């Protein structure tokens, strides 16, 4: 898999500076769902950060955008990898009201925000490039979407 790359940003500087690069074992996630790509800024918890992101892989209905979750420590070491796509609701599946922005895209679930809300976690995301959604997951549901990377 591609390494986790951390960047440092200091206002009002608009340049992102490399802060570290960390290799990790994705246990075959990339081979099935594609490499992890962009997503929401990391959200802190008691001893690290959660990062909701996405990957893209070919499917019979077109390229499918899968939401995923990983966790890393403040020093950048990835401690938990996705054990599959993050199960976010999509009642529309591949149906759209408008023409596709990307003619090759099938189902698109694109995470854009992650925030703690009491004991739960709120995840904002886009569906098929035309709808926005909000899912609230409990801490156990979040933890079930990842597996610990052996030390």
PLM feature segments, named:
Residues 1-34, 44-104, 120, 125-151:
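Beta-rich carbohydrate-recognition and catalytic domains
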Residues 38-41, 106-113:
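Beta-propeller and closely related beta-sheet repeat lectin domains
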Residues 76, 113-114:
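A short, hydrophobic secondary-structure junction motif
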């Amino acid at each position: 898999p591609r390494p986790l790359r951390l960047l440092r940003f200091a206002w009002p500087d608009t340049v992102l500076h490399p802060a570290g690069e960390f290799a990790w074992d994705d246990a075959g996630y990339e081979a099935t769902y594609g490499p992890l790509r962009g997503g929401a800024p990391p959200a802190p918890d008691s001893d690290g950060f959660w990062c909701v992101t996405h990957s893209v892989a070919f499917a019979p209905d077109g390229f499918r955008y899968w939401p995923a979750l990983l966790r890393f420590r403040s020093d950048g070491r990835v401690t938990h990898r996705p054990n599959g796509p993050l199960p976010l609701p999509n009642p529309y599946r591949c149906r759209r009201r408008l023409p596709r922005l990307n003619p090759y895209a099938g189902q698109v679930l694109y995470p854009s925000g992650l925030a703690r809300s009491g004991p739960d976690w709120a995840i904002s995301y886009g569906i098929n490039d035309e709808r926005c959604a909000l899912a609230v997951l409990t801490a156990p549901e979040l933890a079930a979407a990842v597996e610990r990377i052996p030390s």
